[in-house]
Amino acid sequence: MRSGVIAQKLGMTRVYNDAGEHVPVTVLRLENCQVIAQRTIEKNGYTAVQLGVGFAKVKNTSRALRGHFAKVSVEPKAKIAEFRVSPDNLLDIGTEITAQHFVPGQRVDVTGTSIGKGFAGVMKRHNFGGHRASHGNSITHRAHGSTGQCQDPGKVFKGKKMAGHMGQVRVTTQNIEVVSTDVERGLILVRGAVSGSKGAWILVRDAVKRPLPDNVPRPAGIRQLAKEKTEMVTPVTETSEAEGAE
């Protein structure tokens, strides 16, 4: 089980696939997503990584969090979240996860907070049909009607669909397809809509109900791996040039 990521919702747009079909996508951005803490079986009883993303001003960060970030030598983060991982996918503190953590065609589960709608009636909140517009109806056109029974059971059952607060709840949408990624700009494009307003923080994980593709990076798509590959190639090139000069 790999770690998820924290992304910021930028909005929606559309792209075209190889067949020329228009695909609506939501654009998610990874900005400075780093591991800031570990949870191990020996110390905590489970394995997980704590991620921080974005940037926050020091003056707007609590003293406790300032000490937490200073302990691991990272800048204050705007958002923190914890992801359960298997022991073999545990990441080192300070590791930065990039958009290459996911691959096109992969299915992911996306979690966000839906847009709040305030106090809503049953027609908007539960898609009720409403009452008749005329023929004896008086000021009950959008009412929900009867809410209970007679003396037995003499109560309104829990879960009864009625008017009330709508939205502003945690919503997880499963099995969303990753259309494409842009590692340089830190963008992940997923098919369809994602709960949350523009600028909202979104949690993206590997889908639990779909198999993981074979070509996903393990333990994660991290920026340090790319640097190590570059450093390994550079000395070989310099050596070969020196031998040629001799």
From Swiss-Prot:
GO terms for biological process: translation. One of its GO terms (molecular function) is rRNA binding. Signal peptide: none annotated. Methylated by PrmB. Keywords: Methylation, Ribonucleoprotein, Ribosomal protein, RNA-binding, rRNA-binding. It holds the Pfam family Ribosomal_L3. One of the primary rRNA binding proteins, it binds directly near the 3'-end of the 23S rRNA, where it nucleates assembly of the 50S subunit. NCBIfam families: L3_bact. This is Large ribosomal subunit protein uL3.
